[in-house]
Amino acid sequence: MIVQRVVLNSRPGKNGHPVAENFRVEEVNLPDCVNEGQVQVRTLYLSVDPYMRCRMNEDTGSDYITPWQLSQVVDGGGVGIIEESKHTNFMKGDFVTSFYWPWQTKVILDGNILEKVDPQLVDGHLSYFLGAIGMPGLTSLIGVQEKGHITAGSNQTMVVSGAAGACGSLAGQIGRLLGCSRVVGICGTPEKCLFLTSELGFDAAINYKEGNVAEQLHKLCPAGVDVYFDNVGGDISDTVISQMNQNSHIILCGQISQYNKDVPYPPPLPPAIEAIQKERNITRERFLVLNYKDKFEFGILQLSQWFKEGKLKIKETMINGLENMGAAFQSMMTGGNIGKQIVCISGDTSL
């Protein structure tokens, strides 16, 4: 059987911006036989995420993710349906997910890298397992719980940068659910600002491309900032940190503004900002959700419950077709998405 896959065509260079042409689609032959312990899956949805930018370099600069290889199939978060199984834990028709799903229309995988998912948890929206009821949701929930130090009733103000993205859009809502009295988002378009305040219940939103961010932040957070969910790093974060309170907390989720630069992760703060951080005893610890696997099961159930109760609003930007994986990745890296960027490979769940 001939199937399509996406391979890494070229590297953007450590300081380069990724483009769709860094990827290419090719046809390959899928083996006819599924061996013991393997399953054949049809890919339904694939995820593109900021961390993947590091995988485009020869060296990811990280000890927990490996680089993609030139002319080899690219992989990441995926959801699909099992067409044939020779693994004891799975049967034909099961829906499964993996963090290491090849960008391929159909593929034979080792069953041990897969996890079964229950469509009822997401009311049939299987792509949510790649977003709010998946790794971005867990990153937001566990990050806020473990590093945010939110105490209900203590009038804390939370600021979220990259607030209209996959993690940011969830983190702000979770901050409110856990007890923050004021939540302010920072994003890059008027449309995103409106989305945050009218659909997600943020108290206010700042478009960092318009006006003075420091002045707007001062006006919208008169009592200062207690919790900062940092998705972007760079100048925006320096501005927020300078308005943070004594003994406040930074949740270091991502540094997308720095991903096309050859700097360590997390990037060091400028000396003046670092001085503020130390003087005010602001915590800024690297946060890696994979260190909290023991909390995943409960976390998924909590996120699903909030979603079903209407307390957690979920937004996706969906593109169709494996051939658009590169374009979807490029768009996501430049803020083209609201909520989670997803690529639909096949909407067909019949067998």
UniProtKB/Swiss-Prot annotation:
| Binding annotation for NADP(+) | 165-168, 192, 208, 231, 253-259, 287-289, 337
- Stretch forming the signal peptide: none
In terms of InterPro entries, this protein maps to: ADH-like_C (IPR013149), ADH_N_2 (IPR041694), GroES-like_sf (IPR011032), MDR_fam (IPR045010), NAD(P)-bd_dom_sf (IPR036291), PTGR2 (IPR037399)
What subcellular locations does the record give? Cytoplasm
Keyword Transferase belongs to the record: no
Keywords, comma-separated and alphabetical = Cytoplasm, Lipid metabolism, NADP, Oxidoreductase
Q: What is the main EC category here? A: oxidoreductase
Name of this chain's protein: Prostaglandin reductase 2
> GO MF terms on file?
15-oxoprostaglandin 13-oxidase [NAD(P)+] activity
Q: How does it assemble?
A: Monomer.
GO biological process terms on file: prostaglandin metabolic process
Catalysis performed (reactions): 13,14-dihydro-15-oxo-prostaglandin E2 + NAD(+) = 15-oxoprostaglandin E2 + NADH + H(+); 13,14-dihydro-15-oxo-prostaglandin E2 + NADP(+) = 15-oxoprostaglandin E2 + NADPH + H(+); 13,14-dihydro-15-oxo-PGF2alpha + NADP(+) = 15-oxoprostaglandin F2alpha + NADPH + H(+); 13,14-dihydro-15-oxo-prostaglandin E1 + NADP(+) = 15-oxoprostaglandin E1 + NADPH + H(+)
Predominant place of localization: cytoplasm
Q: What is the stated purpose of this protein? A: Functions as 15-oxo-prostaglandin 13-reductase and acts on 15-keto-PGE1, 15-keto-PGE2, 15-keto-PGE1-alpha and 15-keto-PGE2-alpha with highest activity towards 15-keto-PGE2. Overexpression represses transcriptional activity of PPARG and inhibits adipocyte differentiation.
Q: Which family does it belong to?
A: Belongs to the NADP-dependent oxidoreductase L4BD family.
CDD domains linked to this entry: PTGR2
Entries under Pfam families matching the protein:
ADH_N_2, ADH_zinc_N
The protein's organism comes out as Bos taurus
Instruction: Give residues annotated as binding substrate.
Output: F99, Y100, L288, V289, L290
EC number assigned by the record: 1.3.1.48
NADP as a keyword of this entry, yes or no, is: yes
For this protein, the record's PANTHER family field holds: PROSTAGLANDIN REDUCTASE, PROSTAGLANDIN REDUCTASE 2
Q: Which GO terms describe its cellular component?
A: cytoplasm
